[in-house]
Amino acid sequence: MNMQDANKEESYSMYPKTSSPPPPTPTNMQIPIYQAPLQMYGYTQAPYLYPTQIPAYSFNMVNQNQPIYHQSGSPHHLPPQNNINGGSTTNNNNINKKKWHSNGITNNNGSSGNQGANSSGSGMSYNKSHTYHHNYSNNHIPMMASPNSGSNAGMKKQTNSSNGNGSSATSPSYSSYNSSSQYDLYKFDVTKLKNLKENSSNLIQLPLFINTTEAEFAAASVQRYELNMKALNLNSESLENSSVEKSSAHHHTKSHSIPKHNEEVKTETHGEEEDAHDKKPHASKDAHELKKKTEVKKEDAKQDRNEKVIQEPQATVLPVVDKKEPEESVEENTSKTSSPSPSPPAAKSWSAIASDAIKSRQASNKTVSGSMVTKTPISGTTAGVSSTNMAAATIGKSSSPLLSKQPQKKDKKYVPPSTKGIEPLGSIALRMCFDPDFISYVLRNKDVENKIPVHSIIPRGIINRANICFMSSVLQVLLYCKPFIDVINVLSTRNTNSRVGTSSCKLLDACLTMYKQFDKETYEKKFLENADDAEKTTESDAKKSSKSKSFQHCATADAVKPDEFYKTLSTIPKFKDLQWGHQEDAEEFLTHLLDQLHEELISAIDGLTDNEIQNMLQSINDEQLKVFFIRNLSRYGKAEFIKNASPRLKELIEKYGVINDDSTEENGWHEVSGSSKRGKKTKTAAKRTVEIVPSPISKLFGGQFRSVLDIPNNKESQSITLDPFQTIQLDISDAGVNDLETAFKKFSEYELLPFKSSSGNDVEAKKQTFIDKLPQVLLIQFKRFSFINNVNKDNAMTNYNAYNGRIEKIRKKIKYGHELIIPEESMSSITLKNNTSGIDDRRYKLTGVIYHHGVSSDGGHYTADVYHSEHNKWYRIDDVNITELEDDDVLKGGEEASDSRTAYILMYQKRN
């Protein structure tokens, strides 16, 4: 070769031009000699790799254009080679560039040449066995694409083939694959199996069983299904029904081997169905025999279970028993009921129970109780409500039939609000007013469990430094009032960084700080840390006594100091007359305390913005509850969200109406018509309602009186006044009043009052007071202090003043019990008529008693008896002294004349 020819030819290597070494003589070694190059880059490259560096896999590992030669299954034969003579062409129109000199050999395209190197007649070419890149080869058709390829991927054997010289070669050779065939990218598409129907015997039949047979697989599926049913603790009837369904599915599925409960969707051809159908009878017989054996075992197990059920009663009862069951189970149940022995109730399969539960929930969503608001979405046009009045603190101006009642706790699962983050105090207070399940939901929430101040109460005394026994006795009684502590705990979860700061909730924060010291966990952690120097001498004794009683109550040295609480009270205007060291009335302090908490919560609600109200309404997932919220928003007339209401909020209030829509004046009068017993219409009566804005405190302690004043010869025959109350004051001055029930009846007796009619005549009016609504926590005060007038010698009464009269204490014993049922005589007729729960709505249990010791009203001492629900015990707390009591000890006091301890305030809670 001259230099001019070398310049014309493009070089592929930096090494001198050499010819490929001759391949070794074919032997029986099962190793590949030459392999196709491996593409290393995403673009066209032609790297030179030695044959031993390439894995001998006959699969498309790199991409779909990877060269896979059909001779790979037979390592004795080299792949055919493209024409490397400059004058020849290939089928795929590759640009052939000469690398090595050829001496006229014959290529696979039929071009002739001299066989200078291949003189041995072995049928093998001594030229380069592969091209530099697979794109230049016309033989990169994969062997798997050929329908005629065998399991060893070899080509059709030809006994006679001509070599390059035209002579017949005796050694066997293989014809090349048809180069006109194109590579099929979708060769594994199951729809193309129709084209290979004639060769379906060589295809893999599905389902494929490895190390097993079709009958064994079906039997194993039956056993696995039975084990799953036993794990679900179902009865034998459901197992038999499932086995019948599974058996029928076994005869109709395409694969004829997979049970119904584990069936998979498969695409098969008609030819495969015929092949599988030929194999079905043998597998079906084996499965049928196995099913008979398992049914015999299930019958024995069913009898054993029936005997156990007859001997042992059912612990639980399925909630849904009215639904229709499958026919098989009905027939079995009828056969069982014919026997004289008692049979257990037929249980349902788990799928039937689940479907019935869904149906029952849907039905319960459609059915609305009489005390609930009709379920209507917010986008609706009307909202149905019940015709009864509001609950205890819903003391409205209206007696319209559109008034809705406080939603009761639901039997169905509670849908909690979807709140985001910590809410302000006003939002929490609103939820507690109108969502009866909100308090219990918050207390069950694990996220706020560690934030509440009081988890479990440990009895502790309160140090009496300056005649504050009236305050400590009230705080102790409220501490053991569980509904009140629940309200305090939920209010403690508020967002303290909201616009309504702590300055407007002084008493609430003081109560939280005070009651946190009675928490058992807090006390146990700080048992020794908070001991004063004066108490260190008794520290070890207190520790021993407390541990010996498992912290049931603390020693005297561990009493709570009320200094901070008292200091906070002195800064509140309502308690401005409170003087340190001056004795006060316990009932008066209790009333002021509840009033102040009520006002602070109302102030927090009034401070809510329109945006906060919209967020709260959006978080409510119960449509009935949402409508009830909207109807009560207008009761907060001084609130910012009412004064600056957005058009959207105004639209909602106008759509669903308001609770009090009969009068615009806060304490206005309105007229209602009545009727006599004979059915004739009487004169109209004036009705006046004193409105109280709802708060968590008023919902808990607030009730309502109905005072009826009958005026003869007057324009209005009756005057009805609805007044709220937090404490019922019972007069016990009458000699016939010796027990609590008689005091209630005496409370509702009519009294005659002088009255001037509308015509100007003096008449005698008759007045009666009834209980219209009962609170959840009933506070009762005995009127033990009465004013006694001095009488002169002529038996003429003198002026009513402090100089001519005196205040004396009524020290007689008033009997009361642990249970109280409000007599019907004390309830209003409307309440009794609308009451659906009967006597249970008037049933209470005793939880606290405040005693007064002494004979005068301006002195004496206060103690308290409290019921600890967690310990199920009564404790008597006298400042720092705590004594455990029997139940009967609480009912004693005042029997003897020398005993000045008499019950003054009773606390009753409604029984759940």
From Swiss-Prot:
Biased composition (Basic and acidic residues): 1-11, 260-310
Segments forming domain USP: 460-911
Biased composition (Polar residues): 361-384, 396-406
Region Disordered, annotated ranges: 1-30, 68-176, 241-384, 396-417
Entry-linked InterPro entries: Papain-like_cys_pep_sf, Peptidase_C19, Peptidase_C19_UCH, USP_CS, USP_dom
EC number: 3.4.19.12
GO molecular function, one term: mRNA binding
Ranges annotated as biased composition (Low complexity): 82-95, 102-140, 159-176, 335-355
Disulfide bond entries: none
Reactions catalysed, as given in the entry: Thiol-dependent hydrolysis of ester, thioester, amide, peptide and isopeptide bonds formed by the C-terminal Gly of ubiquitin (a 76-residue protein attached to proteins as an intracellular targeting signal)
Active site: 469, 861
A GO BP entry: protein retention in Golgi apparatus
Comp. bias (Basic residues): 249-259
Top enzyme class: hydrolase
CDD domains recorded: Peptidase_C19
Keywords associated with the record: Hydrolase, Protease, Thiol protease, Ubl conjugation pathway
PROSITE patterns: USP_1, USP_2, USP_3
One term under GO cellular component: nucleus
Miscellaneous comment text of the record: Present with 2210 molecules/cell in log phase SD medium.
Subunit structure: Heterotetramer with BRE5; contains two molecules of BRE5 and two molecules of UBP3. Forms a complex composed of CDC48, DOA1, deubiquitinase UBP3 and probably BRE5. Within the complex interacts directly with DOA1 and CDC48 in a BRE5-independent manner.
Primary role: Has an ATP-independent isopeptidase activity, cleaving at the C-terminus of the ubiquitin moiety in natural or engineered linear fusion proteins, irrespective of their size or the presence of an N-terminal extension to ubiquitin. Plays a role in regulation of silencing by interacting with SIR4. Also, in conjunction with BRE5, cleaves ubiquitin, leading to the subsequent mono-ubiquitination of SEC23. Required for ribophagy, a process which relocalizes ribosomal particles into the vacuole for degradation in response to starvation.
Family according to the record: Belongs to the peptidase C19 family.
Name of the protein described by the UniProt record: Ubiquitin carboxyl-terminal hydrolase 3
